[in-house]
Regions:
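Boundary/entry segment of secreted carbohydrate-active catalytic domains
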Residues: 1-28
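C-terminal domain-boundary segment and adjacent tail
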Residues: 2-8, 51, 104, 137-148, ...
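A short acidic, amphipathic alpha-helical/loop segment
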Residues: 5, 29-33, 125-129, 209-213
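Hydrophobic "anchor" residues on beta-strands that sit immediately upstream
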Residues: 17, 73, 224
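Active-site metal-binding loops of divalent metal-dependent hydrolases
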Residues: 20-23, 78, 199, 229
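Metal-dependent polysaccharide deacetylase catalytic core of the NodB/CE4 family, i.e.
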Residues: 35-128, 132-136, 142-161, 191-199
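Non-membrane alpha-helical structural segments and their capping/turn regions in soluble enzymes
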Residues: 89-94, 166-169, 204-207
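A short, acidic, amphipathic alpha-helical segment used as a generic capping/interface helix at domain edges
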Residues: 170-186
Length: 278
């Protein structure tokens, strides 16, 4: 048996996900742009946004209809947007608990994703209480060096770029140019482009930034899997949970998702609960 490598659904080698914070009124236009190009993402909302919508902000009706019905995800961003790194653990626990509780009660959904409200996050104490609070992934505010790698530490998920990064479009070109037919690294490793930011950063005549990005990256369904953060997490988790026989001639998929991978230069799809010969 040669090396096995993950493929995104449909045997794609590339995936794109977006992550936007704070739930401001400018999310309206951002969602419209993303939808127009078939791009999906996760919107990280502080709990206070849904418990007491601000005057001049998104209304209760908009909060209910803007995200999930359009195929996007809502994730935890604390309750009051407190930075856990400069908070006592007990305050951090309360902040994340209340933030998750508020979102779940408002949307009537189980919400397990998160974005840290502040700075690069690698603190093990914080990660420990996030696990206890049922958070399965948390996006950090670091990275931004053009990496297309799938995270190993889901509670320190480093993005590819922020939407104000001057190299964002350069990274997009590199991502699109990676050809699995001619590039060994692109053929071996599935690629993930992760863009994050705040929709209010486009408000001063800068909407062209995200419009150009989405126009370039969208509409490539045969090549790119467009997914929310949680969809990425759940799919990779399902792939990593595959069970192989000792001689690598059989594989069992215990998850509820179909999983795609390549081995011996052949493509394999293993359905939910299915055992296949290789």
């Amino acid at each position: 048996m040669k090396y096995r490598f993950l493929r995104w659904p449909g045997f794609r080698t590339k995936a794109l996900t977006l992550s936007y914070d704070d739930g401001t009124v400018w999310d309206r236009q951002l969602v419209e742009i993303m939808n127009a190009h078939g791009i999906k993402g996760t919107f990280n909302l502080p709990g206070y946004c849904v418990e007491k919508p601000k005057e001049g902000g998104l209304s209760e009706e908009e909060l209910r209809t803007l995200y999930f019905p359009n195929g996007h995800e809502v994730a935890v961003h604390g309750f009051q947007h407190m930075a856990p790194l400069i908070s006592a653990p007990i305050d951090g626990i309360h902040e994340i608990y209340e933030g998750r509780r508020a979102l779940e009660q408002f949307y009537h959904r189980i919400i397990r994703g998160m974005a840290y409200p502040d700075r690069v996050q690698t603190n093990e104490t914080i990660k420990s209480y996030l696990r206890m609070l049922g958070i399965v992934y948390a996006r950090s505010a670091g990275g931004e060096e053009g990496s297309f790698t799938i995270p190993e530490d889901w509670l320190c998920w480093m993005p590819t770029a922020h939407n104000t990064n001057p190299k964002m479009m350069e990274y997009a070109d590199q991502f699109l140019a990676a050809d699995p037919n001619t590039n060994y690294c692109a053929r071996r490793e599935a690629l993930l482009f992760y863009l994050w930011g705040h929709s209010f950063e486009f408000r001063d005549n800068k909407w062209y930034v995200i419009e150009e990005f989405c126009e370039k990256m969208g509409g490539r369904e045969e090549e790119i899997w467009y997914a929310t953060n949680m969809e990425i997490y759940e799919y990779v988790t399902a792939y990593r949970a595959l069970v192989f026989s000792v001689d690598n001639t059989m594989v069992y998929n215990p998850s509820q998702l179909a999983v795609y991978f390549t081995a011996n230069d052949k493509n394999y799809k293993v359905g939910p609960g299915e055992t296949c010969y290789l």
